[in-house]
Amino acid sequence: MKIPNIEHAVFIEAPIEKVWQTLTTSEGWNSWFTDGTEIDLKEGGYIKLRWKNFGIGHYTTEDGGTILKVIPNIKFIFQWSPASSPTTVAFNLEQLGSGTKVLLTETGYPESEKDLQVCIGCAVGWGEALTLLKFFLEHGITYGKVPEK
């Protein structure tokens, strides 16, 4: 079974520097998507993404790994471990007019039924994440906390 790569792209009407800062700093991630994320932004540094009581399911989880590549305002690549072995997530940025194209790819899923299910979940999650990033940077809208029953 060959598990496909995840690939999403979005255009965000925001300067590339602002998109970069939002994707490569703890403050950036925590302002729109996570709660308690930590980033040591350098090649060989680390990223630890944390969600607390997130979304309609009130999920609390974390994942992270090693930062592989940092080219300011162009490329941010890290490994994390949502599957049975690490996968590689790459954000590639490109200036388009007054906005920014963001291309996200995730590669390296092991070939198993369990990892296929994880890949499907991450594909949906990354699509949601880029939509939330766009809404935040263009309109200041965040998902917010969902009340408990």
Question: Residue ranges of each PLM-predicted region?
Answer:
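A short, structured loop/turn motif at beta-sheet edges
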Residues: I16-E17, D40-K42, L68-I74, N92-K101
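Glycine-rich portal/gate segments that line the openings of hydrophobic small-molecule binding cavities
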Residues: I39-Q79
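Intrinsic-disorder/low-complexity, polar/charged segments enriched in Ser/Thr/Lys/Arg/Asp/Glu/Gln
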Residues: N5-A9, Y46, E62, K75, ...
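Beta-strand/loop substructures that line and gate deep hydrophobic ligand-binding cavities in soluble
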Residues: S81-E128
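Hydrophobic pocket/interface hotspot
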Residues: V19-W20, W29, I47-L49, I67, ...
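Hydrophobic ligand-binding cavity/cleft-lining segments
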Residues: M1-E38
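Hydrophobic/aromatic beta-strand elements that line small-molecule binding cavities or substrate pockets
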Residues: H8-V10, T37, E62-L68, T88-Q95
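Short, highly charged C-terminal tails/helix-capping segments
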Residues: F135-K149
